[in-house]
């Protein structure tokens, strides 16, 4: 019999998880394996495996302890959001994307995915039962499943299956790639992942790495892992930032009071749909030239128009939204190439006044500079200040996730032959998540919203007004 009965870390992890599900907890103590069981006794087969694989299991425990780091506040929020006790909860934070490609070489794609897995520890992340993150050293070769794509129904079925998939935080992997093959040359690549391992910027990096490698391009992998970056990262208390937010929340308006079909606590099935708009390359260029002329940032302009549009439909003229920050501290020269979850969040507000739109944008831009200044301050603390002891409530459920680079090029902004055709996200305690990006060579705006909360025509009308308001800015100013 082989010296090793487990082939890799995931085999051991699955074995231990099966025992835990049966009420048996296993841990290492020096050179001994200890256990606690509801039935007090272990089955003979379990005892046999523990005896034969003692060395492997003890090494596994040491590896997990060696690689352990605390979860970030956002990762912790995602874990909590999976529980049914949270308003708009009982779901994971999840992202799903579909691509089409001609003449896909699945074997080559699979090889490149495995290379990227080996180079990025975030793709080997698990959550321990003690509520920490750890990273597996030795995972099995990831095989990309292939299914036959006979018609649109097969693709739609796969989309339904994967677009809201719920991962087990204690198991590997927390991502999934699969391919639908047609009788012709066209294939569909389905990609989804739990956001506890990757933020939106990292997801973009991941796919760029895989696609670049697939086409034979050189990829420079970071010389620092996500784990080691997090160990270098410091979040020292910032008294100035704390005082700023304590004062700010005193007069901060609440989230947009739109025409919600249900109270948040009444929503049992949290499922999202997406509405989106692609601006042309010419429109995007025109918009960015206007922004440049006023010395604004694209994020300030788009977020202000977003808030102004929501204010037109809100019961109250003032409102606040949750802003996603991609907070990479410059602790290493390769920091921008690391895959992982770097997200922090903060809040910006809008007050409907007689001031011009330009003045409103200036006010937003000033707030955003403050967000940059105090970017190390944990957004979870801001939400705690706002919650006033309302545990489990969705405090700031409208989110602005900005991935704008502020310039576009037809030449450099293409993702090879992989054409993105569909995407959707979901996040616990979020009712509306606005994603805005320009990495495809044009401005793309999308809203992911909870189906049971919004009437479809109502949310479509608001979105249409938003698109028109962006176009008015292009033409009027």
Spans of features found by a protein language model:
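His-Asp-centered acyl/peptidyl-transfer active-site segments
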Residues: 83-93, 110, 121-122, 171, ...
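A short, small/polar-residue-rich loop/turn motif at beta-strand boundaries
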Residues: 2-13, 104-118, 135-172, 242, ...
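Extended, hydrophobic beta-loop-alpha segments that form or line the acyl/peptidyl-thioester binding
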Residues: 120, 124, 207-208, 317-324, ...
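Active-site-proximal acidic secondary-structure segment that organizes catalysis
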Residues: 47, 58, 68-70, 180-226, ...
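N-terminal beta-alpha "docking/capping" segments at the starts of catalytic domains
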Residues: 62-103, 161, 196-197, 209-212, ...
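Acyl-thioester-dependent condensation/acyltransferase catalytic cores
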Residues: 12-14, 83, 117-191, 198-201, ...
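Short amphipathic alpha-helices and their capping loops
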Residues: 62-86, 110-152, 171-173, 224-273
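Histidine-centered acyl-transfer/condensation active-site motif
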Residues: 35-40, 98-102, 170-213, 298, ...
């Amino acid at each position: 019999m082989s010296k090793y009965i487990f082939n890799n870390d995931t085999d051991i992890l699955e074995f231990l998880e099966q025992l835990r599900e049966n009420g048996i907890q296993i841990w290492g103590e020096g050179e001994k394996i200890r256990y606690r069981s509801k039935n007090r006794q272990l089955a003979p087969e379990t005892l046999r495996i523990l005896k034969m694989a003692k060395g492997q299991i003890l090494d596994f425990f040491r590896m997990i302890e060696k690689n352990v780091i605390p979860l970030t506040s956002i990762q912790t929020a995602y874990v909590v959001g999976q529980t049914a006790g949270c308003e708009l909860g009982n779901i994971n934070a999840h992202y799903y994307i579909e691509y089409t490609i001609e003449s896909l070489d699945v074997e080559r794609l699979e090889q490149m995915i495995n290379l990227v897995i080996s180079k990025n520890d975030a793709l080997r992340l698990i959550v321990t039962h003690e509520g920490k993150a750890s990273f597996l050293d030795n995972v099995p070769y990831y095989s990309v499943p292939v299914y036959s794509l006979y018609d649109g129904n097969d693709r739609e079925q796969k989309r339904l299956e994967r677009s809201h998939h719920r991962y087990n935080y204690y198991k590997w992997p927390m991502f999934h790639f699969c391919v639908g093959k047609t009788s012709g040359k066209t294939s569909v690549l389905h990609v989804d992942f739990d956001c506890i391992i990757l933020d939106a910027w990292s997801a973009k990096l991941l796919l760029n790495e895989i696609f670049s490698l697939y086409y034979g391009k050189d990829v420079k992998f970071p010389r620092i892992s996500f784990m080691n970056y997090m160990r270098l990262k410091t979040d020292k208390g910032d008294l100035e930032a704390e005082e700023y937010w304590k004062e700010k929340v005193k007069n901060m308006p609440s989230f947009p009071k739109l025409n919600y079909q249900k109270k948040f606590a009444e929503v049992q099935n949290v499922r999202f749909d997406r509405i989106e708009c692609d601006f042309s390359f010419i429109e995007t260029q025109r918009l960015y030239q206007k922004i440049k002329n006023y010395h604004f940032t694209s994020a300030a302009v788009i977020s202000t128009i977003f808030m102004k549009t929501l204010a037109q439909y809100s019961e109250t003229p003032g409102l606040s939204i949750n802003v996603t920050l991609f907070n990479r501290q410059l602790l290493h020269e390769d920091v921008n190439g690391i895959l992982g979850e770097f997200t922090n969040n903060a809040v910006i507000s809008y007050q409907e006044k007689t001031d011009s739109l330009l003045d409103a944008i200036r006010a937003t831009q000033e707030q955003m500079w403050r967000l940059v200044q105090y970017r190390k301050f944990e957004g979870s603390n801001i939400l705690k200040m706002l919650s006033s002891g309302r545990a489990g409530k969705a405090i700031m459920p409208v989110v602005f996730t900005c991935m704008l680079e502020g310039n576009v090029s037809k030449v450099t902004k293409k993702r090879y032959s992989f054409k993105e055709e569909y995407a959707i996200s979901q996040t616990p305690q979020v009712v509306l998540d606005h994603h805005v990006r320009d990495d495809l060579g044009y401005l793309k705006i999308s809203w992911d919203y909870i189906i049971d909360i919004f009437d479809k025509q109502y949310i479509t009308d608001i979105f249409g007004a938003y698109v028109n308001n962006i176009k008015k800015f292009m033409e009027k100013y």
